[in-house]
Design a protein with these regions (language model features):
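Membrane-embedded alpha-helical bundles of multi-pass enzymes
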Residues: 1-177, 381, 389-390, 430, ...
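Soluble catalytic domains of enzymes that build or remodel membrane lipids, polysaccharides, and related
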Residues: 176-461
Length: 486
């Protein structure tokens, strides 16, 4: 668990000024706190299952007069029940960790299988369902060995066959006979900007601020593509703090006017759209981490980040003392709960997401409630410079790949330091920039329409079906174990 959160050490020590020992301790304490969910799941499994398992072994003499078919069935049930119980408890622990106290779903077990055979289950059950299947197999394997070592070879082979069916046969059948749930919705060229502004300079006037304003303006004004996307807070100042001529020149460019004529500019021939990350608001109305769209016609679109980062964008209750120990320029952002619709542009429907918002697939699914209004492409705009040269860029790319698999949608990522990339609807990175370099990625994505089973049920009921199913399994098997002991 500590390795999942190791990149927080860089934020707190390198950029927050905490002593190294204190930053390391904070990461360790967070990992310990989040491990409690799984400790409770393991304790519950031992309490409910192990006693029943030992009871069955101690009283196995009572089976002596039963037919061999009964013995086989009882041993198979013994192994399957233990594995299913463990998978249900594990999944409940992951769901609780991912939802409670703003949610900490990094490192969910399903992400480890995004490039494995289990990836075929993503459009059906999502990352938590994949984690449940992985947990089922992980506990089923040692229980199978236990059954075989107890000289119940036939029962062991049955359990092995069940594992092979789940891991190999069923995925192969799904790939072979189940068609894609989505269909092509046309292609579009896109230009993704990666400014590589050092985090310790990003908000410093005269250095990082000036560099960002100059470089991003140059790229936005020179853009020839129909769509251009900047990272999160690429413009590191409030809109009202920008020189009037700066924003006006961008407005003129994407409204299709020349600065001198104020008339339609037909130079490029095609309408253009820019998605720009910047902070919005003011002291009287509050601040938000936002995306503004610039385009032709009467286009007006603004997306405010919905799921804020604890400590980074808002301070949780009772933790002011911890924040005061750091000198990170923390944002006092408001937590907006207004529904922002998808952005329709040139035949595509774009859903902007800021930073780690694409980690919460159940929140992304809310935009898929109506098929004819569902996004055709997911757009992630991030600034992972806070975490330095760690596993954070690769980890967040893997998260985006899983979202692509769950919804069968392309994901385009524009980040400050990487990984800026194009991901297709199969979860494959088709094009990317090297991390920690300044550059521009130009490519093409294919939008998709249609809904996966995962998109259908999560858009209607969230994660409740999975939660209720696992809870019902635990209650049923728990009652069954108690009756068996009596």
């Amino acid at each position: 668990m500590s390795s999942t959160w190791g990149w927080l050490y860089v934020s707190m020590h390198q950029y927050g000024g905490l002593p190294s020992w204190l930053a390391a301790l904070a990461v360790l304490l967070l990992a310990m706190a989040l491990s409690v969910y799984f400790a409770m799941a393991g304790g519950a499994w031992v309490t409910l299952y192990r006693k029943w398992f030992l009871h069955a072994r101690q009283h196995e003499g009572r089976y002596a007069t039963h037919a061999k078919s009964f013995l086989l069935r009882s041993e198979v049930n013994l192994g399957l029940a233990g594995a299913v119980m463990f998978a249900a408890l594990w999944t409940l622990a992951e769901l609780a960790r991912g939802q409670w106290f703003t949610g900490f779903p990094w490192g969910a077990a399903g992400y480890a299988h995004g490039n494995s055979l289990l990836a075929v289950y993503a459009p059906w059950v999502g990352v938590y369902g994949m984690g449940a299947i992985a947990a089922l197999v992980a506990m089923g394997a040692p229980l199978m060995v236990s059954v075989m070592l107890s000289r119940r070879t036939r029962a062991g082979w049955v359990l092995l066959a069940a594992g092979v069916l789940l891991l190999f046969v069923l995925p192969a059948l799904l790939v072979r006979f189940v068609p894609s749930f989505t269909a092509p919705a046309g292609t579009m060229s896109v230009r993704l900007l990666q400014g590589n502004i050092p985090q310790d300079e990003k908000f410093i006037p005269g250095t990082g601020v000036q560099t960002a304003l100059t470089w991003y303006a140059e790229q936005l004004l020179a853009n020839p593509e129909p769509l251009v996307v900047t990272p999160e807070t690429a413009i590191p100042v409030l809109l009202q703090q920008l020189p009037a001529a700066y924003w006006q020149s961008l407005n003129d460019k994407y409204a299709g006017r020349t600065a001198n004529q104020g008339a339609q500019n037909t130079e490029s021939g095609n309408p253009q759209l820019a998605l720009i990350g910047l902070p919005m608001g003011g002291a009287n109305v509050g601040y938000s981490n936002s995306v503004l769209a610039l385009g032709s016609g009467a286009l007006k679109y603004r997306y405010d980040k919905q799921h804020l980062v604890p400590f980074g964008e808002f301070v949780p209750p009772f933790f002011q003392w911890f924040v005061r120990m750091m000198n990170i320029p923390l944002g006092d952002f408001g937590q907006q709960r207004t529904y922002a619709s998808v952005l329709s542009w040139q035949g595509q429907r774009l859903l902007p997401q800021i930073c780690y918002e694409d980690l919460f697939g159940e929140e992304v699914a809310q935009y898929f409630a109506l098929e004819n209004q569902a996004p055709t492409v997911l757009v992630n705009m991030s600034n992972l410079a806070w975490f330095g040269n760690t596993t954070a860029p690769a980890q967040h790319t893997a998260i985006s790949q899983l979202r692509a698999l769950e919804f069968q949608r392309p994901v385009i990522r524009a980040t400050n330091t990487g990984l800026t990339a194009l991901i297709n609807h199969k979860g494959e990175v088709t094009k990317s920039l090297p991390t920690f370099t300044r550059g521009v990625l130009v490519g093409e994505f294919e939008g998709r329409t249609g809904l996966t089973p995962y998109a259908q049920w999560t858009s209607q009921w969230g994660l409740w079906p999975l939660c209720l199913l696992c809870g019902a399994i635990v209650l049923f098997l728990g009652a069954f174990f108690r009756r068996s002991r009596s």
